[in-house]
């Protein structure tokens, strides 16, 4: 525990808080060509590369990912959730925060069903997470 004299000399400092999705905390003023500190829940970007990568040690799969250049000029790696996708280079996508635990360096998710990204086909449960519309009722 500090003495009164030590507190007078140095005082207490706040803990430094670090963002888990830093690219969403930067904006870009295109008129002044300057970066701004404006946070956003999602950001739009253009795919520069779409591919697959393998996860960390105990898991085994081919996880789909896209390299995305955001509107603020930052390029990030984002995970494509769900089974099957229609993304290719130059597709316009919406990204949100949220890491993928077994893919190092992937801190963002692509939002399915927004902009150029199609929803997951034939999905019946958890549709809102994968951008799938409600199926039409079958005729009797």
UniProtKB/Swiss-Prot annotation:
Entry keyword annotation includes Iron: no
Keyword Iron-sulfur: no
Superkingdom classification of source: Bacteria
Keyword terms, alphabetized: Ribonucleoprotein, Ribosomal protein, RNA-binding, rRNA-binding, tRNA-binding
Pfam families: Ribosom_S12_S23
NCBIfam families, alphabetized: rpsL_bact
Descriptive protein name: Small ribosomal subunit protein uS12
Organism per entry: Bacillus anthracis
Gene: rpsL
């Amino acid at each position: 525990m500090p003495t009164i004299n030590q507190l007078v000399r140095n005082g207490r400092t706040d803990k430094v808080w670090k963002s888990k999705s830093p690219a969403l905390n930067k904006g870009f003023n295109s008129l002044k060509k300057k970066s701004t500190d404006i946070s956003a829940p999602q950001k739009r970007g253009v795919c520069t590369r779409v591919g697959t990568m393998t996860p960390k040690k105990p898991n085994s799969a081919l996880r789909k990912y896209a390299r995305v250049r955001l509107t603020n000029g930052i390029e990030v790696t984002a995970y494509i959730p769900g089974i099957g996708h229609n993304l290719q280079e130059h597709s316009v996508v919406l990204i949100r925060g949220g890491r993928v635990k077994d893919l190092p360096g992937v801190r963002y998710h692509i939002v399915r069903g927004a902009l150029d990204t199609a929803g997951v086909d034939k999905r019946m449960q958890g549709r809102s997470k994968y951008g799938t519309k409600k199926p039409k009722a079958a005729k009797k």
